């Protein structure tokens, strides 16, 4: 994947402003609410019976933070995302058996959360760079499925 200097700058500069705790918990919560079939991968998280329960669930928040923190690795390794996610791809494919389409859904949720948090700073050019990044990450996570 080729990244222009502008794309790299847009991604990295926005990432420095991201509150990983807040955005991560919100992103995973939204995924579980908007796409309820994804909840089956998180049955050990306890109460996921309503949007209120999901948004208040400390395990959802903690795992969301973990997911967003992992996403930060992509930001740091834009030129080597496939290798960065090799072990996570293997885990999600061979052990967790996650439908790889869910990675695209989570990527879409990431975009929504970033847009909600950054408003006018999340310009169309910034969105395009981030959209590219979430697609590259989703593809890297799905790599072991092929």
Curated annotation (Swiss-Prot):
Q: What is this protein called?
A: Hemoglobin subunit beta-2
Q: What is the lineage of its organism?
A: Eukaryota, Metazoa, Chordata, Craniata, Vertebrata
Quaternary arrangement and interactors, per the entry? Answer: There are three forms of hemoglobin in Sphenodon: A, A' and D. Hb A is a tetramer of two alpha-A and two beta-1, Hb A' is a tetramer of two alpha-a and two beta-2, Hb D is a tetramer of two alpha-D and two beta-2.
The GO biological-process annotations, alphabetized, read as:
hydrogen peroxide catabolic process
PROSITE patterns associated with the record: GLOBIN
Output one GO MF annotation.
Answer: haptoglobin binding
Q: Where does heme b bind?
A: 63, 92
One Gene Ontology term, aspect cellular component:
hemoglobin complex
